[in-house]
Amino acid sequence: MTEAMKITLSTQPADARWGEKATYSINNDGITLHLNGADDLGLIQRAARKIDGLGIKHVQLSGEGWDADRCWAFWQGYKAPKGTRKVVWPDLDDAQRQELDNRLMIIDWVRDTINAPAEELGPSQLAQRAVDLISNVAGDRVTYRITKGEDLREQGYMGLHTVGRGSERSPVLLALDYNPTGDKEAPVYACLVGKGITFDSGGYSIKQTAFMDSMKSDMGGAATVTGALAFAITRGLNKRVKLFLCCADNLISGNAFKLGDIITYRNGKKVEVMNTDAEGRLVLADGLIDASAQKPEMIIDAATLTGAAKTALGNDYHALFSFDDALAGRLLASAAQENEPFWRLPLAEFHRSQLPSNFAELNNTGSAAYPAGASTAAGFLSHFVENYQQGWLHIDCSATYRKAPVEQWSAGATGLGVRTIANLLTA
């Protein structure tokens, strides 16, 4: 194996020969990253992406100044879905090293799971991977139930069954209970609900290739909340939390759902399907009904739900929606502590009525008269949260996945959001 390239940190500017804006320089001893105090974590991440671009696949983080956050920033930029990389980590105290190791184990799991081809990651595989990850960190403090196929229809999970029935791979609901108290009557502190569409063709409202080619990542919300629960457990979560993953393919077949179909949910809501490519909200509705039944203090759902959120925020921020200002403020404070990008977008009472249908209580998509697509999608979901004005957060995961590399990230999944949700759960 080639000798590791040493990477050191300096608060001094680079030699003038490297240019006045140089963020790194190279010498006989290795590569030096020149921190300026303005955005040191971002600088380290961008430099790591450049180092990987140079073809350097074996590095040693050396010298003073490295801590868990800086090591993690380097790894976020250095990691990529293709090829192998090796990092020799610096000496850290036990707590910092444990924090880094947990990030590497869990957030890399999130990134790798989202990057997995749809052919190898179907609904059942996604649910089982989630069980395996959380069982690994929680042991016997976790129990779970997997419901699939026709059992979903018989038990009233009509949104999930309707969306997933067009695929040969059965739709799946994972209901997982992390209960560190061991008391079956212990109150549920929080419920996490994730959209797990393992491939989204758009159904009969079919996507163009340019919009379908990244749709293996449409289960990013499910992976994110799974990782968040696992990470919170490693940080000492001592409250009962339930996880609901709504997993399905959205494909075309003779058995696939069609425009004009009407879905009747367990809470009595009837929804007319006018766009089969607005399927995420249809499966999440089932998970939110289950979450509401637990009477938790908070419900957090996460989904790669709308293109409108990406139009507003790009892939740089997750979009946050809530009627609960105090809870939204707590999540944004957690995001600031974890250095993760979240931005709150509007959600008002009138968004709940901007999905009119001539044949049902709700339409599953907005019209040209109501163009705020991310907000109306959140408004749709609110109809399936019993007390939607308090204790509910909706995250439209626009920062989950990048189709092309940028200066801080390789192509593929980012893992952003895991630490923020875990922080909120353990605050």
From Swiss-Prot:
- E.C. number(s) listed in UniProt: 3.4.11.23
- According to its UniProt record, which reaction does this protein catalyse? Release of an N-terminal amino acid, Xaa, from a peptide or arylamide. Xaa is preferably Glu or Asp but may be other amino acids, including Leu, Met, His, Cys and Gln
Q: Which GO terms describe its molecular function?
A: aminopeptidase activity; identical protein binding; manganese ion binding; metalloaminopeptidase activity; peptidase activity
Residues where Mn(2+) 1 binds: D200, D277, E279
Q: Report what the protein is called.
A: Peptidase B
- Disulfide bonds, which pairs? none
**Principal subcellular localisation of the protein:** cytoplasm
